[in-house]
């Protein structure tokens, strides 16, 4: 051990690719927190990722019982225990890496007792993560993914910002395919503070995400649309077209098997024979059915997540 510590600086002579490969093995091991801890103990971490050592002794107070460095190791370990992939583990390890550089003491906080603030640490941390991963020669795709997760990890910490429209925006930023990965990083952050995995708030976030991601219940789901009605069936644009589409929607909501071109083309011909008054009645009934279906789907999601 003493020899390793004494000659730790020699790791600078090892290629970045080799160091990355060995570091990745540690991160993907069952006990990555122990592995990273050993790198620090042997004096190697400061030559590989010195940015992590900036968190040693960097107190956070408030909800946190660990310093930044310890918190990151606990978050990483949770990702490993869950069997989550490399990107999640690296994002867990780096998610608060920008805190030491953004820490400020604000004496006006906590009722005048004062507290540390870390405003913008997610922005600084995302930039740091990219530099670290570029230095270690990680693939660009991996680096970009980790940086995106680090940059957005605070979204689910701000309870005041959690609205359906806000969830839609964050989904747009990270991508539908990555939103659940971001939630995994959020869970790592929470468990890294010695808190339970799935409190009510986290379950509520899951329900809101599913609500945002589910397919909309609208005429856009029909096998025919306004373009088909005009271009192929010769219908003129106007209120009647809208009423017909909503009338078709009501039937499809009752029986999804009817959502085929063959069936709907026939129904369009039949509906065209109706008066404006009858079509309007069909359209209003369809809107009511649509709203009821949406309400039931939202209730189902809330029941599923216990919120």
Predicted regions and their residues:
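Conserved, well-folded catalytic cores of nucleic-acid-processing
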Residues: 153-156, 232, 251
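Histidine/acidic-rich helix-loop-helix segments that form or flank divalent-metal centers
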Residues: 54, 58-67, 73-77, 138-198, ...
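Generic structural marker for isolated residues within well-ordered, non-membrane alpha-helices
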Residues: 129, 167, 226
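Alpha-helical scaffolding flanking metal-ion-dependent phosphate/phosphodiester catalytic sites
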Residues: 88, 93-103, 164-212, 232-235, ...
């Amino acid at each position: 051990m003493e020899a390793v510590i004494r000659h730790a600086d020699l790791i600078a002579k090892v290629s970045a690719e080799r160091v990355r490969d060995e570091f990745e093995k540690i991160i993907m091991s069952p006990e990555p927190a122990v592995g990273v801890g050993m790198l620090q103990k042997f004096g190697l971490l400061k030559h590989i990722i010195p940015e992590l050592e900036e968190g040693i002794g960097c107190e956070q107070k408030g909800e946190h019982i660990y310093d930044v460095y310890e918190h990151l190791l606990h978050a990483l370990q949770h990702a490993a225990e869950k069997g989550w992939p490399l990107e999640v583990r690296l994002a867990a390890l780096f998610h608060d890496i920008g805190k030491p550089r953004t820490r400020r003491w604000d004496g006006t906080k906590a009722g005048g007792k004062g507290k540390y603030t870390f405003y913008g640490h997610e922005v600084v941390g995302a930039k740091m993560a990219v530099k670290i991963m570029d230095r270690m020669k990680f693939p660009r795709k991996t680096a970009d993914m980790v940086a995106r997760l680090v940059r957005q990890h605070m979204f689910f910490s701000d309870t005041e910002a959690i609205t359906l429209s806000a969830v839609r925006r964050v989904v747009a930023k990270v991508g539908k395919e990555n939103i659940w990965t971001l939630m995994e990083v959020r869970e790592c952050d929470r468990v890294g503070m010695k808190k339970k995995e799935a409190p009510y708030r986290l379950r509520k976030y899951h329900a809101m995400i599913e609500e945002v991601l589910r397919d909309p219940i609208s005429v856009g789901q029909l096998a025919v649309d306004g373009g088909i009605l005009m271009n192929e069936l010769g219908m003129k644009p106007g209120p009647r077209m809208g009423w017909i589409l909503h009338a078709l929607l009501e039937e499809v909501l009752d029986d999804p098997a009817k959502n085929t071109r063959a069936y709907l083309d026939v129904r369009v011909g039949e509906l065209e024979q109706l008066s404006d008054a009858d079509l309007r009645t069909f359209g209003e009934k369809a809107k009511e059915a649509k709203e009821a279906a949406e309400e039931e789907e939202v209730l189902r999601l809330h029941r599923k997540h216990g919120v």
